Curated annotation (Swiss-Prot):
Family: Belongs to the bacterial ribosomal protein bL34 family.
Keywords for this protein: Ribonucleoprotein, Ribosomal protein
Pfam families per the UniProt record, alphabetical: Ribosomal_L34 (PF00468)
Gene Ontology molecular functions: structural constituent of ribosome
Organism: Limosilactobacillus fermentum (strain NBRC 3956 / LMG 18251) (Lactobacillus fermentum)
Protein name: Large ribosomal subunit protein bL34
Keyword Ribosomal protein among UniProt keywords: yes
Disulfide bonds: none
TM spans (from-to): none
Compositionally biased spans, kind Basic residues: 30-44
Length: 44
């Protein structure tokens, strides 16, 4: 059986990356929450 997670750097960045988060208002809210929480890494 094939595993479901087949990692690709480009897809990860495009879907979950910083610029993807910044491109929508809700994504900016995500980053704000993670900054407030004190996350070391804000996005993928």
């Amino acid at each position: 059986m094939k595993r479901t997670f087949q990692p690709k750097k480009r897809h990860r960045a495009r879907v979950h990356g910083f610029r993807a988060r910044m491109s929508t208002s809700n994504g900016r809210k995500v980053l704000a929450r993670r900054r407030q929480k004190g996350r070391k890494a804000l996005s993928a």
